[in-house]
Amino acid sequence: MDTAFPVCGIVAEYNPFHSGHRFHIERTREMLGEHTIIVCAMSGNFVQRGAPAIIDKYARTKMALEGGADLVLELPVPFATAAAPIFAEAGVSLLTRLGCVDALCFGS
């Protein structure tokens, strides 16, 4: 699917969303263009290894949107609570199956 602007996917937990996450989104736009659409695949109320998130998914979504994301999608619980390889694979799969994501950007 062609879009007028590039679409970049980010797989994250944002537990909680902080200035480093904001920097990651800003830097992604610097690299891909200021009109890049940022779509995040984020864990819900439970994160990797089944731990409860320290802030609920709605508040974390709001923080991500206020921090520069354009769309936040919830990674289903069985994948969000899995080990890192499964978490990552599911996040990438969710984003690529949207059919509009042009790039993925990861931080560390």
Question: Which residues does each predicted region cover?
Answer:
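Nucleotidyltransferase catalytic core that binds NTPs
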Residues: 1-108
